[in-house]
Amino acid sequence: MIKTILIDDEPLACDLVAEYLQDFPQLQVVSRCHDRFQGMKAIQEHQPDLIFLDVQMLKISGFELLELLEDPPAIIFTTAFDEYALKAFE
């Protein structure tokens, strides 16, 4: 089982990703977080294998949150904005 955390400040977007992930039984969503504080707490608590991380959130970007992690797990960036897609590959 792959422990997965969803971090997105838009609850509907978080729900949509969770719905898509239901087609992948090997992924277990252990937490849905809607801000950086919930996200950091969930990461420390669950030690996930994978994080779906929104690029643009209030007060902090997904890129900035990633920099706060000492030993980050695999990250899949999510965004509704084309301009962030290229930066996510860097």
Label each region the model flagged.
Residues 19-24, 42:
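Alpha-helical interaction/dimerization surfaces of two-component signaling modules
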Residues 14-15, 85:
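Charged phosphotransfer/docking patches of two-component systems
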Residues 7-8, 33, 51, 78:
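Conserved sequence signature across two-component system core domains
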Residues 13, 22, 58:
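The feature encodes the CheY-like receiver
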Residues 24-30:
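A generic structural motif
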Residues 40-90:
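CheY-like receiver
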Residues 1-3:
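Non-catalytic signal-transmission and effector/linker regions of two-component phosphorelay proteins
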Residues 30-39:
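Conserved Asp/Asn-Gly motif in the active-site loop of CheY-like receiver
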